[in-house]
C-alpha cells in the first residue's frame, strides 16, 4: 500500500521545487516514488525529468478521452533517482476547469492500477483555490503538507488549506503532517515568527525550514533537483538537510500529524500585525 502525500501551497512560493526535492530525498532513501503535478503550468516534474512532459489532458485529447486506450507509458516519464513523473495539465485558457483535470488524472491512476506500484505517491497541487477537483488528492492522501512563506498571503492560503483538510478528515483518513517554511532568508534577518504563531494556533508544526538560497533557484531552472547539482556547489549540503529531514520524518513508522483547526481572518491579521 502506497504512502500518499498531498503537497499544497500558494502559487509562486516554490511549492513544486520543494515537492521535487522531497521526492528526490524519499527516492534516495530507497522509496519508489511517483510525483503527480496538479497545476495547469505542468512544470512540477521538470526538475525530475529535465523536460516538460506530455500531460494527462494532452494524452486524453489524443484518444478522444477514452481512458481505456491509455497506458502508463503514455503519461509517465522516469527521471532522477528512478522517480516517475506525471503531469495532469489543464484546459485551454478561458475554458474548462483545472480542478476537473486533476480529478480526471486521479481516475486514470485508479484505472491503470498505479496506486499499488509505488512506495510513495506525491501529489503537487495548486493551493490558491481548493475547489472540488483540486481537493481530490486529499481523498486519497495519508498526509497533507503545506508549503508556506513567512508572509500574510501565504498564511492566508495556508489557513484555507487547513479548512479543506479539516473538512476532508471527516470522511477520509487525511491528516496534516505539518508546514514547510520555504525561502527563509537568514542572511537578511528573515525568520519564521509568523509561521510559528500560525502553526501553533491551528495545531500543527513546522515540518522543516528551507533556506532562501540561489542554488535552489538555479537548480530549478537547470531542470534538476538540488540533489543532482554538483557537490562542489557552495551551500549544497546546508540546503539538502531540510528535504532529508522531511523524508526521514515521513518514512518513519508513525509521522507526527493532526487534524488542523483553522483560525478566523481577524486572527491572521493579528499574527501579521495588521489588526489589534
Curated annotation (Swiss-Prot):
One of its GO terms (biological process) is photosynthesis, dark reaction. It catalyses: chlorophyllide a + oxidized 2[4Fe-4S]-[ferredoxin] + 2 ADP + 2 phosphate = protochlorophyllide a + reduced 2[4Fe-4S]-[ferredoxin] + 2 ATP + 2 H2O. SUPFAM superfamilies: P-loop containing nucleoside triphosphate hydrolases. Mg(2+) binds at residue 16. [4Fe-4S] cluster binds at residues 97, 131. This is Light-independent protochlorophyllide reductase iron-sulfur ATP-binding protein. Component of the dark-operative protochlorophyllide reductase (DPOR) that uses Mg-ATP and reduced ferredoxin to reduce ring D of protochlorophyllide (Pchlide) to form chlorophyllide a (Chlide). This reaction is light-independent. The L component serves as a unique electron donor to the NB-component of the complex, and binds Mg-ATP. Belongs to the NifH/BchL/ChlL family. Homodimer. Protochlorophyllide reductase is composed of three subunits; BchL, BchN and BchB. Pathway: Porphyrin-containing compound metabolism; bacteriochlorophyll biosynthesis (light-independent). The keyword ATP-binding applies. One of its GO terms (molecular function) is oxidoreductase activity, acting on iron-sulfur proteins as donors. Coiled coil: none annotated. Its EC number is 1.3.7.7. It comes from Chlorobium luteolum (strain DSM 273 / BCRC 81028 / 2530) (Pelodictyon luteolum).
Amino acid at each position: 500500500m502506497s504512502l500518499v502525500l498531498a503537497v499544497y501551497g500558494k502559487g509562486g512560493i516554490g511549492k513544486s521545487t520543494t515537492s521535487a526535492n522531497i521526492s528526490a530525498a524519499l527516492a534516495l532513501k530507497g522509496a519508489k516514488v511517483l510525483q503527480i503535478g496538479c497545476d495547469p503550468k505542468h512544470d512540477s516534474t521538470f526538475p525530475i525529468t529535465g523536460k516538460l512532459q506530455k500531460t494527462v489532458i494532452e494524452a486524453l485529447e489524443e484518444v478522444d478521452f477514452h481512458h481505456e486506450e491509455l497506458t502508463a507509458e503514455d503519461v509517465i516519464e522516469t527521471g532522477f533517482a528512478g522517480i516517475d513523473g506525471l503531469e495532469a495539465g489543464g484546459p485551454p485558457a478561458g475554458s474548462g476547469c483545472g480542478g476537473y483535470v486533476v480529478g480526471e488524472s486521479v481516475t486514470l491512476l485508479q484505472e491503470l492500477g498505479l496506486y499499488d506500484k509505488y512506495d510513495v505517491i506525491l501529489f503537487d497541487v495548486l493551493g490558491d483555490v481548493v475547489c472540488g477537483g483540486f481537493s481530490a488528492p486529499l481523498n486519497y492522501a495519508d498526509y497533507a503538507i503545506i508549503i508556506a512563506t513567512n508572509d500574510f498571503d501565504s498564511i492566508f492560503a495556508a489557513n484555507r488549506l487547513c479548512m479543506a483538510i479539516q473538512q476532508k478528515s471527516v470522511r477520509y483518513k487525511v491528516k496534516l503532517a505539518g508546514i514547510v517554511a520555504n525561502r527563509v532568508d537568514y542572511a537578511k534577518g528573515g525568520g519564521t515568527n509568523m509561521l510559528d504563531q500560525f502553526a501553533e494556533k491551528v495545531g500543527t508544526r513546522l515540518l522543516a525550514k528551507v533556506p532562501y538560497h540561489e542554488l535552489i533557484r538555479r537548480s530549478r531552472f537547470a531542470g534538476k533537483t538540488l540533489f543532482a547539482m554538483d557537490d562542489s556547489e557552495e551551500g549544497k549540503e546546508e540546503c539538502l538537510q531540510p528535504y532529508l529531514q522531511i523524508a526521514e520524518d515521513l518514512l518513519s513508522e508513525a509521522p507526527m500529524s493532526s487534524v488542523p483547526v483553522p483560525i478566523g481572518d481577524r486572527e491572521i491579521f493579528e499574527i501579521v500585525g495588521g489588526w489589534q
